[in-house]
């Protein structure tokens, strides 16, 4: 018995408008996930054969492969004077989009240990953001933390670098009168600081976040395994789009001068998100369905 095509067509139910809207919304959300420019990585520890880090100066992966050692030690493991080392993640970060003027948000968390054989440690570490081609400035050991040359350390018009420093030695020319965590914007003189009590040889944690909507750079640090039980917090309002180029690299720097300590990073995670112009347009359509 023959069945007419007309009857077959009549038995098919049309797709309902709510279902069509749901499918459209789902496809937009799926597309939006792929419309952001993000950088994400995690180091639970560091391997001697690490290939996704750029090591500069005296920085190296410890022989045991458990930490990133920023400054030099002698054969007995004691820190030496006048050492500078930096480590940067190999893949550049798209910090802002010149075609849309949109700016990325990011968050990074790391653990570190600073240890010294004396009660006068120097000089500290910094998490920093700089142009992709950045290298160690000449003469930047000691209080300059491997970030600035002596000639332009206090001239913010000659630098492109934003850093969060964990400073253990007071340099009277630019530091407050105590050990501190500071936010540096194109100069070694911090724009915002908080007094910081360094715990020799203890594990420290730090979380640094940037909100692209509020333009606020925030820092929280603590020593979770000590009796201190104190969070050190500092923040600063800064438009990174006006201070840094569109593409940058992120990393760590450490230095010793006349006084010394070991500077070791034990773990590091980083996550950023830069929404594209396509995702912004899709947000408008998504709101119509929600």
From Swiss-Prot:
<comment type="similarity">
    <text>Belongs to the leguminous lectin family.</text>
</comment>
<comment type="subunit">
    <text>Homotetramer.</text>
</comment>
<dbReference type="InterPro" id="IPR016363">
    <property type="entry name" value="L-lectin"/>
</dbReference>
<keyword id="KW-0479">Metal-binding</keyword>
<comment type="function">
    <text>Bark lectins are storage proteins that probably maintain stocks of nitrogen during dormant period. Self-aggregatable molecules that can bind their own carbohydrate side chains. They could also play a role in the plant's defense against phytophagous invertebrates or herbivorous higher animals.</text>
</comment>
<feature type="binding site">
    <location>
        <position position="171"/>
    </location>
    <ligand>
        <name>Ca(2+)</name>
    </ligand>
</feature>
<feature type="glycosylation site" description="N-linked (GlcNAc...) asparagine">
    <location>
        <position position="200"/>
    </location>
</feature>
<keyword id="KW-0732">Signal</keyword>
<feature type="binding site">
    <location>
        <position position="175"/>
    </location>
    <ligand>
        <name>Ca(2+)</name>
    </ligand>
</feature>
<keyword id="KW-0465">Mannose-binding</keyword>
<dbReference type="Pfam" id="PF00139">
    <property type="entry name" value="Lectin_legB"/>
</dbReference>
<feature type="binding site">
    <location>
        <position position="165"/>
    </location>
    <ligand>
        <name>Mn(2+)</name>
    </ligand>
</feature>
<dbReference type="InterPro" id="IPR019825">
    <property type="entry name" value="Lectin_legB_Mn/Ca_BS"/>
</dbReference>
<feature type="binding site">
    <location>
        <position position="167"/>
    </location>
    <ligand>
        <name>Ca(2+)</name>
    </ligand>
</feature>
<dbReference type="InterPro" id="IPR050258">
    <property type="entry name" value="Leguminous_Lectin"/>
</dbReference>
<keyword id="KW-0325">Glycoprotein</keyword>
<feature type="binding site">
    <location>
        <position position="167"/>
    </location>
    <ligand>
        <name>Mn(2+)</name>
    </ligand>
</feature>
<feature type="glycosylation site" description="N-linked (GlcNAc...) asparagine">
    <location>
        <position position="155"/>
    </location>
</feature>
<dbReference type="InterPro" id="IPR000985">
    <property type="entry name" value="Lectin_LegA_CS"/>
</dbReference>
<feature type="binding site">
    <location>
        <position position="175"/>
    </location>
    <ligand>
        <name>Mn(2+)</name>
    </ligand>
</feature>
<feature type="binding site">
    <location>
        <position position="180"/>
    </location>
    <ligand>
        <name>Mn(2+)</name>
    </ligand>
</feature>
<comment type="function">
    <text>Mannose/glucose binding bark lectin.</text>
</comment>
<keyword id="KW-0430">Lectin</keyword>
<keyword id="KW-0106">Calcium</keyword>
<protein>
    <recommendedName>
        <fullName>Agglutinin-2</fullName>
    </recommendedName>
</protein>
<dbReference type="GO" id="GO:0046872">
    <property type="term" value="F:metal ion binding"/>
</dbReference>
<dbReference type="InterPro" id="IPR013320">
    <property type="entry name" value="ConA-like_dom_sf"/>
</dbReference>
<dbReference type="InterPro" id="IPR001220">
    <property type="entry name" value="Legume_lectin_dom"/>
</dbReference>
<feature type="signal peptide">
    <location>
        <begin position="1"/>
        <end position="35"/>
    </location>
</feature>
<keyword id="KW-0464">Manganese</keyword>
<dbReference type="GO" id="GO:0005537">
    <property type="term" value="F:D-mannose binding"/>
</dbReference>
């Amino acid at each position: 018995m023959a069945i007419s095509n007309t009857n077959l067509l009549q038995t098919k139910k049309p797709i309902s408008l709510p279902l069509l809207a749901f499918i459209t919304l789902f496809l937009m959300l799926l597309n939006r996930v792929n419309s952001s420019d993000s950088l994400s990585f995690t180091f639970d520890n560091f391997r001697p054969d690490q290939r996704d880090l750029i090591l500069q100066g005296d920085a190296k992966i410890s022989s045991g492969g458990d930490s990133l050692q920023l400054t030099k030690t002698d054969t007995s493991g004691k820190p030496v004077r006048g050492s500078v080392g930096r480590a940067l993640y190999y893949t550049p970060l798209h910090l802002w989009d010149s075609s849309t003027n949109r700016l990325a948000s990011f968050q990074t968390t790391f653990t570190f240990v600073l240890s010294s054989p004396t009660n006068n440690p120097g000089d500290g570490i910094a998490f920093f953001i700089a142009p992709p081609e950045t290298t160690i400035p000449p003469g930047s050991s000691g209080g300059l933390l491997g970030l600035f040359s002596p000639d332009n350390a206090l001239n913010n018009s000659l630098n492109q670098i934003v850093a969060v420093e964990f400073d253990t030695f007071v340099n009277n020319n630019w530091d407050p009168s105590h050990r501190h965590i500071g936010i540096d914007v194109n100069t070694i003189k911090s724009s915002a600081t908080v007094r910081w009590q360094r715990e020799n040889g203890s594990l420290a944690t730090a979380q640094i976040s940037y909100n692209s909507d509020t333009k606020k750079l925030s820092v929280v640090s603590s020593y979770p395994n000590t009796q201190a039980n104190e969070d050190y917090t500092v923040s600063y309002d800064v438009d990174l789009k006006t201070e840094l180029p569109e593409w940058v690299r992120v990393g760590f720097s450490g230095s010793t001068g006349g006084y010394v300590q070991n500077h070791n990073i034990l773990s590091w995670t980083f996550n950023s998100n830069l929404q594209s112009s396509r995702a912004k347009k899709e947000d408008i359509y998504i709101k119509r369905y929600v």
